[in-house]
Amino acid sequence: MSKLLDTINSPSDLKKLSLDELRELAVQIREELVNRVTLNGGHLASSLGVVELTIALHRVFESPKDKIIWDVGHQSYAHKLLTGRREQFATLRQHGGLSGFTCRDESPHDPFGAGHASTSISAGLGMAVARDLAKEDYSVISVIGDGAISGGMSFEAINNAGHLHTKFIVILNDNGMAISPSTGALSKFLNNVRFDPRFEFAKRNAKQTITNMPFGKAVWAFTKSIKRKFEKSMLPGSLWEELGFIYLGPVDGHNIRELEAALKRAKDFESKPVLIHMITKKGKGYDDAEADAVKYHGISPKSGGLKSSHGLSYSQVFGQTLHKIMSQNPQVVAITAAMTDGCGLGEIAAAFPDRVFDVGICEQHAVTFAAGMATQGYIPVVVIYSTFLQRGFDQIIHDVCLQKLPVVFAIDRGGIVGDDGKTHQGIFDLSFMSLIPDMVVSAPSDENDLQHLLYTAVNSGKPFALRYPRGFGEGVEIESSLHNIPIGQNEILVNGSDVAILATGKSVAFAREALEILTESGIKPTLVNNRYISPLDSELVLKIAQSHKYLVTVEENVISGGLGSRINTLLAEAGLVNKIKIANIGIPDKFVEHGNQSLLRAKYGLDGKGIAQRVLSLVGNPNEMKHPQIICP
């Protein structure tokens, strides 16, 4: 790490630097980001794009007194470097180290934790109103990207902020050119005028002078109408001003001097929220990331790029299968929320551009949009990461299941996802989806199971959830033809005695590993692929309970409300609680921290060794568990 960056231990150190030193610091920060993210993995392109903004923010404002809120938080790496976490930066996204997002527990400079999009304006407005109620004096700044601002929650907050007239700053990081910047001499002139305090002074005095003249109010109203028409045709900020914001920009997001001028100007406004429109280049300063910002949005550890392929990932198998199904059935459509490539829909979107819909970061809308299409005879497949589907829970109940509409939910990244941590682990979906009446909930044991379950879902005529994990498949042979798997029918993979392991999804593969360990100890368990969580294969569960002494459930999901809980309830209702000993292996009632998938599975007893140890503990202590109990690692 270069010497200049080594001297920055807190934001106050930035204020001692000259403009040339600040520019050099920006170069050094980018070098550190590229080096560290290449080793540890993480979100690179977004962080590279806001280096100058981060420097300017910490020079103009006084963090942590002033509150700087980063939407999503994945672009906060430079912020971490400049706020006393430089020496810990090598631990970024490592188990026990710095989070890849903002985190209140990590630093007072992170006033609001993040991981999901579109929350920063609501949170910032809440802080600003709390400040006013307490009669305190500090600034609140929310930084949000042009993707995250498309989320409905952002617009709800913007509408509320304009109504409240609270002192509050929103910075729109426009790195996708979704809002075309004005260019040329006129734009530069207007920006210079807007950032000049004399402009507001002159405007206020002009209004006072004109309105005091005969017919002055009418003249002023006419003048304002002309101004509005001019702005609507020439300036990108008229929408914001209609919403009650003062608009500043567009600003060059890589010009520290211009950024500081805009921030200082925004800081001076007392009675209205301000929006600063900043234009940046995603991946700035790293040629590969600038050339392909989508690819370098998130990279894997020690590769400097995307994961090398040693087989097909679950997302790829899903995409290939859906492509095949859509080729055969023109009524099938795909819907995603700003994750076309991440969810394996890229090639499908190219092949069927009229039948693949990316609705932006709008999960609630995605679900009800799908419901609307389903009423007209289409079969929508909604493809969303598990952690983000939580946002559409009410719509799943109210708009899909209450009306029994045939919407398929392809839930990617189910289970432990790893280094992205607490905000991204997909550990609640089996619970919240299986509690909804009329919802089929399934989890394939491997990639072949996945393709057949997707085919089943599309042909079921029911609300159907298909949950699959992050990462590569199990390497099994993928059959060329698709077939239906009867809903609610699970399968015995291995016949054994005394002990039965009922595993779902990815846990089936780890249960197979456990069988090898247990066999060496003289235990030969029955293994069930519990692919359907709802409806349960009650007949099979009861049959196993009556023919085995021990029953173990395994799932990468919170135990509460998941597979284990449902089986416990079934056995209790059948009066079998005193006839079989039960252990439920899963996630305890806690949020799972960041760390690689293998480490976390080992920690929570979800790998083959952990499952085997739990079974040995259960079988080796006959006095334990006279009644069903939840057993957590």
From Swiss-Prot:
A GO CC term assigned to this protein in UniProt: cytosol
UniProt KW keywords: Isoprene biosynthesis, Magnesium, Metal-binding, Thiamine biosynthesis, Thiamine pyrophosphate, Transferase
GO biological process annotation, one example: isopentenyl diphosphate biosynthetic process, methylerythritol 4-phosphate pathway
Cofactors demanded by this protein: Mg(2+); thiamine diphosphate
Keyword hit for Magnesium: yes
Recorded GO MF terms: 1-deoxy-D-xylulose-5-phosphate synthase activity; magnesium ion binding; thiamine pyrophosphate binding
Listed pathway(s): Metabolic intermediate biosynthesis; 1-deoxy-D-xylulose 5-phosphate biosynthesis; 1-deoxy-D-xylulose 5-phosphate from D-glyceraldehyde 3-phosphate and pyruvate: step 1/1
Positions contributing to thiamine diphosphate binding: 74, 115-117, 147-148, 175, 286, 363
InterPro entries recorded: Dxylulose-5-P_synthase, THDP-binding, Transketo_C/PFOR_II, Transketolase-like_Pyr-bd, Transketolase_C, Transketolase_CS
Keyword Magnesium: yes
Residues reported to bind Mg(2+): 146, 175
EC number(s) per entry: 2.2.1.7
Domain of life of the native organism: Bacteria
Alphabetical list of Pfam families matching this protein: DXP_synthase_N, Transket_pyr, Transketolase_C
Cofactor binding note: Binds 1 Mg(2+) ion per subunit.
Catalytic reactions of this protein: D-glyceraldehyde 3-phosphate + pyruvate + H(+) = 1-deoxy-D-xylulose 5-phosphate + CO2
Record's function text: Catalyzes the acyloin condensation reaction between C atoms 2 and 3 of pyruvate and glyceraldehyde 3-phosphate to yield 1-deoxy-D-xylulose-5-phosphate (DXP).
Similarity comment: Belongs to the transketolase family. DXPS subfamily.
Binding partners and assembly: Homodimer.
Name of the featured protein: 1-deoxy-D-xylulose-5-phosphate synthase
